[in-house]
């Protein structure tokens, strides 16, 4: 940065240059055109100095030209021949020595010809210039005036050629050369400066020759040597050119003859060396001879009289001039300058240097009067001698100067003195200060004598030291009438490098009391105190000014005029402004810039400097080039630079026109108009206001112009009800009055606000404000109405009053009557739900009656429910339409059922036959319309606009309902009716920011029967009903289910019901069907804590029993379409299931409002409640039951969508049930791969417990549907918990004891056997898991939570705590496989992610505990699990630890390293490599491009995510990624890749990626993205290749054509890491390393999963704290959107955005970066869970992975070395383009849905966010997120009471604040990632 000075200097330089030329540079004497600058204003007379000797110095000139700095000055050379000869030698010697930089301080001594011989080193060019004062008539005359002392700038004798020694001194206050110490001791210290004999070029010292003339040529030898003063700090290199006033000081560069120059001014009195630190070589004793005051004239020189006389003289001149010319001029402004110039008065010199060189004080001394140390007498030095010494440089001891002029000389005397006297004075700098030390400057500003310098000023001698010793010179007196004249030489505004010109002005420093006191102290230093007082009194009397008894204004006028010119710009305002540009301010700014430097702009700065360099002129050789133009001496470099600079365009000065100075002259072309314009014609005449017309005398009319009182124009009264204290409803009354002032037609507004309005009372507050024009008033009215009514969503009564008209009343939003109706309907629904629950319990025992009958019942019920819901959730018309659709529609309507008010959870359960909102919409168009209506209503309520995307056929539609639970949690239910069309409506319901999209899949559509749907709902209800028991039951049920699923697939749902019942019993009692009393007590306490009604609690208990039976049944029902109803019948008939699921959801919500958070159902159902323990929970439950009658297992299939044929599906489905449980628990988002019914998982942490598990996802791929419709995959929380807790028990041996040990925190959560820790058990579990994978078709889901152990990635994953080798896994029977997979997943999950990979080695107990913890504590209570290592709080540390490990783990660079947990999972990487190798054989998928760090961020969000399996359909072996220790590990998997992520105690969702690819499309779909930073979040996305569904994680599966797809959702509800373990049949179950803190990557399979589900997953991801969400636009089933969620808190998750089209070739993984570029997705990172803008925010995914279109043909291989996703054959761009297009479409849907549901998505993620935050702030965030969900859900739920809205708003605000706080905390970690 160039200092401000430089620019000013350039400009001033140009100005000075022109002035020089104008001012008589023509003088022959000034060969160089040394311009005499008239100093001061006065009369600027340029006096040409004529050098007496004609031969003056032509010869010298060429030499001078070399001197770059002062060529002009140098060339004016010495007139005397003697000077010539001297100069030649001195110049020749000096030229090589001249430093490139100008002498820092150059004092021009105009008057004194400097004789000093120039020392070779110090030789300075001496340029004598004799300036004849303008005042003198004879310019040539050598009158002393020409050497005005004012102008004399003594060359620094300091200027010593060797700058280095001097520099430090310069930095000190004293100039190095000057020994300012006045102390008598004359020490040789001065000699320090440089040992050069003071050589003053004896140039013009011709006393004899030319007499006066020679005297005039005072060659001021200015030091060209920069040394002392030249040192960077110091003096300006400018020579002052004496300005005309009479002082032309020829500034000759005076060779500082006294280079040694330690100058000490000796004060006769012992002045302490105040002046300087230098040598104190002043002999105080020697008194300067009287000759110092040599004027013969002893007469007192009255300075004030002289000034006054001169002023009057100038005044008379001005008056005469005015009389002659009529022009006024003020020539008397510079009276003092004129006087000094005329009288040649002695001055002190203050040099102001540019930049940081500071300012200095310089004193004159008489070079010709030297004190002889022996005799102690003054001896004049002979000038001639020194001149003769010219040849011998340095011989002369001192340059002789003519004696100092007497202090007060008359003009006549001064003239007579001829130049001898004054001009001889040398000048020496004695002190130097930085500008920060401005004491002297302040004194000068105040025109006061500086008392602290009095000793210096009074001193009579100056001692200078050089190599030869110290010489003491006489110092002329500077006092006149007690005042001192200071000559200010300002070098700051001139261009220092080129000239020695300075601006000079003179200031009269007057004595003050302080100086008087200082003098007394000095004079009376030896006197006693009494004498001192007497002396002081006399001095005070003598110096007191006379009293003026006749005041005269002329005195003031004279003072003003004499200062006029100087004070022009000296106003206080200007001075204040100038402080910004003082050197201190500039230094401060430079320092600031230095430390706030923006790195990376160095090149820009360099180019700027280059442009500022002057162009090299014709001197190409550089010989002539000045240093400025030739920056370097190297010709090569110079040539390069010049060629370069010529190419660098300079700033277009030509383009920028200079600003013309303003002129007061009229423009030349301005002329008076020819004809006068009649102003009156156009102006409007107003009669004067004081002369009112007759009509206005008595009083103005209302509209009279004189009336300044505003008149009322119109009024708006807005009234609404608000909740007041004690449940009282207060009237919120706002009156907006619009006034208009008749006088100026201005509109005014008045706003009156009364928050508790009562008729006739005015308790509110009002304010008035100006509106201006009518347009502004209208705009204000419109905006105010929109804001107050929340754009019409809020119920507000608006009354519009216009004087003289009838009032107009309008209403917005829901009125109280409507609200009451809705409430009544909700109550009815709740009652029905209770009935249904009872029926369901009965039905569970009963075999499923004909599915059709139940479906018809359900349809009827759905109609009823829909009607009821319509009241609850802004009119749900869809259910009616759905009823028409029958079974398929019913499946879809499950979501609606959940949507029913969950405030009364039990009541919400509808009759099993009636799926309240489940009935799928038969007619898409009709459904879409109601949905839109509902959405619009919801939007109005919430401010959030939900736009439903009907991408699929009109048949598919989703309805969303918000149900508010008694505990204050909102449940958002989205109904998605499975449509035959593959398109999935992407409806994002925004409930408190949670988006639930029911997934409609072609497969689901194909599954026409709704019984499976009913089953799923019932399971959900059961789970909801029994919080903890559900987990336990599910754990056991899954065991049973695994065994029974096969049976169920073959048999009716009855077996499923039995299994469910068993599972439920297991959950409640570990083994008993009935709920555990302890569990019930926990549930009760949870419900109480949630502020739920006791009724709800009772209902929940009932529901828990029902769910225990009913969950199993519901799961079974979901699994089997026909039989599923019967299965659910264990609690109720299939139709009953709906009710039961509602009741269960209600129970779940009520029991643990926060616990529900972020449990996505594999089907579209997603429940998110972030705050497990918080009463306000928004639970989004999407029940998508796929209508396929037989795909009860489809839900499980959803998990594991069989890559192979349907038969595979059946086994897979069984596995899926177990895996579903895991998914439900662990995955916030789960998508159903198949067309089967989908079930929702609810995980509620009443006390941090997981209460609800995913319901069975009935929907499976079509293949799956064909395989076993009857098979129900029941994912019950109990089963899931059991599996997670005790993998061995859950996995293969349903009979194996699953001791459901509920962790202390949550009764249900610890349903798993922690006993299983033993290796054999682990082996069993592994074997079961492996069995699942091996026996089951690749589709079979192996949900293996690999313990985070280093070995976890290995197939055996022994370290994981799966000690079971692959053999064991294969040994387990296929039938048990599903259970085994779950158990494996659970086992892995069981290893607490917090414990990290290290703990993962610990036995299964560990894993079980982790899973249990996860289950039990969704939020922060992970440790509560019985896991031995885990303390309840460990999960948080674990998460943090994971995050750290990810960040630090070096493994990130290579896939396996990232895949393997960086810490303990080294083994993982080899397995990864193997897997990669296996995959590589078929396809090359290079993951290097992928940035694992982002994945890690996403993974980190999933606390429990440990193993993610990526299965490429074409490959027999899936790739399993283990995230343990925060890293992904790839495990070689058998043919099936199952990703089971189990969150640690905190983790809420398990990522299960089941590759379901139709055999057709197995290869093409899967792309696994790994972020390069392997750290915790590499969830390497489970890559399950699903033909149409991208795997949830970073895996993008591109199903080429197969309708069946998988969704992999890695969700971490709890802060604890989620591990997504995907194990293939061949390989060990997932290697689950603990995942990143909280992130869920959900890559739903868009096609299979209903749009709602897909949306839920991405949204869930989005809601994760940090990360952008995965936005999946659901367009066609085939289209797949992959969004990976950017890591919640700490890490950016990989955002996979965009839909992957069904074409197998298109694999798009859009990295977060691309997303960010597109700004399609909002990253939740900053927003945290609270932001709605998910769609718009760019996701920070470091890499976009696009798999080439060839993916279908070529398998994707993850290279172990780098995580880059390379598509081997297909161009990435092509793929990206279609994908982008799809993404754009999806994103458009998403943006419609997400923006409306953006809030929803963020809340869906919030549970992951909670997971992330959970570690840090799990509970807070969950609460916030719940609140947020509730707040956002308001619009989504069609009917929300005003109270709910307010509660939601409050919750949302709270959450946002907390989220913001969390985000702030996380920002640093995010940045690091």
Curated annotation (Swiss-Prot):
Main location, first listed in the record: nucleus
Keyword Transcription regulation listed: yes
GO cellular component, one term: SAGA complex
Signal peptide, first to last residue: none
The entry's keywords: Nucleus, Transcription, Transcription regulation
Alphabetized GO MF terms: transcription coregulator activity
Descriptive protein name: SAGA complex subunit Spt20
Compartments (UniProt record): Nucleus
Similarity-based family: Belongs to the SPT20 family.
Record keyword GTP-binding present: no
Gene Ontology annotations of biological process type: chromatin organization; regulation of transcription by RNA polymerase II
